[in-house]
């Protein structure tokens, strides 16, 4: 990833494609969450999140916010895998349906695109417990904008 000086601070040039999407899932928030990429293509993102004590609510289950954050980084990674050069993304809207409590030790998510457009992409992420039962399904819209804006 190349860097450039802009307004007195260093900024990293944004990569695109599946390789850049792997980087998305290995840095910042995903790393703090304990996300581990399994496979990334332009049509499917698969990752796992090792449940940590910080993810647990007072009932001993995975906090809904942790599941939403997991899904958010999955949709972002899928979008990055499909971005044209010189563009970036951000979450515009996210909707979560919870079906059951999240369980330890590892949750698995699969994201698939519902729409890949020029200005927006919509991703659906299904998060499953270790027993394969669906804990949540998240649908999110990602905006596609020039990297300089």
Q: For each of these PLM feature ranges, what is it?
A:
Residues 1-149:
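Terminal targeting signals and extreme-terminal segments of soluble enzymes
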């Amino acid at each position: 990833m190349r860097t450039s000086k802009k307004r007195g601070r260093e900024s990293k040039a944004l990569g695109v494609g599946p390789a850049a999407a792997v980087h998305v899932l290995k840095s910042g928030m995903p790393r703090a969450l304990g996300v581990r990429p399994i496979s990334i293509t332009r049509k499917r993102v698969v990752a796992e999140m090792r449940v940590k004590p910080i993810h647990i609510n007072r009932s001993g289950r995975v906090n809904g916010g942790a599941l939403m954050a997991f899904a958010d980084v999955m949709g972002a990674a899928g979008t990055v895998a499909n971005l044209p050069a010189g563009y970036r993304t951000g979450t515009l809207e996210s909707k979560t349906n919870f079906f059951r409590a999240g369980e330890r030790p590892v949750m698995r998510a699969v994201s698939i695109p519902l729409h890949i457009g020029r200005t927006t992409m919509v991703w659906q992420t299904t998060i499953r417990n270790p027993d394969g039962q669906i804990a949540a399904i998240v649908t999110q819209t990602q905006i596609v904008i020039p990297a300089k804006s």
